[in-house]
Amino acid sequence: MLTKRIIPCLDIKNGKVVKGINFVGLREIGDPVELAKIYEEQCADEIVFLDITASFEEREIIGELIGRAARELSIPLTVGGGIRSIDDFRRILARGADKVSVNSAAIENPELIRQAANEFGVQCVVVAIDAKKRADHRGYDVYIKGGRENAGLDLVDWAKKCERLGAGEILLTSMDKDGTKTGYDLEMLNDVCTAVNIPVVASGGCGKISDIVEVFQNTRSDAALFASLFHYGEATVDEVKDELIKNNIPARIIKKETL
């Protein structure tokens, strides 16, 4: 059985890590590269950098930040935010990122997914999807522009289309759960995990270690992504991995040498 991945997510605004509740009320946390290095030391499997305002304000991701992170990290780095073209993919990968996450532009131009997969390989293409439960509780709507605009797409339909176009992975965020620390949206995750055959990364709502255990025990999610739990020092990646192992959930661990 493949090991489950633990992925700290660093939401970046103006070059600093921030975190808010339901995509608003942002507060600054710290330097993204320094935080990423700490998480790698704690046995994180990957790191995600998301420029959460780039798409809305039409700003480009700061290349220097990506390059610095890529030089100082040995684990995979995914970068997203403000991705609009195949040139953006090319530029970010050239800076040293391992994967590129695309959200708004993939909906506006779905062929971008196919083009990127053909040129760089499906392993480099992550489609980030922000979704919110409909008022009638019958399914989920997809949102773009940092969660500010309803894209008019059904979540499951869009996820399946992303897979057909060549996405190698889906990063699925529950807008209802994001920042609330009330646990992942298991229903939403199950809807998508059963509809596609590519890896799904669970995001939005993690507040305690047991939430991570729960998402792996109750969904087919391949990875869990979270921010608040780590950024505020409420838990470490090591502690999460230990709890997964205790619950017979496969996870990568590094045996530390004893003096």
Swiss-Prot record:
Protein name: Imidazole glycerol phosphate synthase subunit HisF
Effect of F120L: In strain: IL1403
Annotated catalytic residues: D11, D130
InterPro entries named in the record: Aldolase_TIM (IPR013785), His_biosynth (IPR006062), HisF (IPR004651), IGPS_HisA/HisF (IPR050064), RibuloseP-bd_barrel (IPR011060)
Subcellular location: Cytoplasm
Oligomeric and partner information: Heterodimer of HisH and HisF.
EC number(s) stated in the UniProt entry for this protein: 4.3.2.10
An example Gene Ontology biological process: L-histidine biosynthetic process
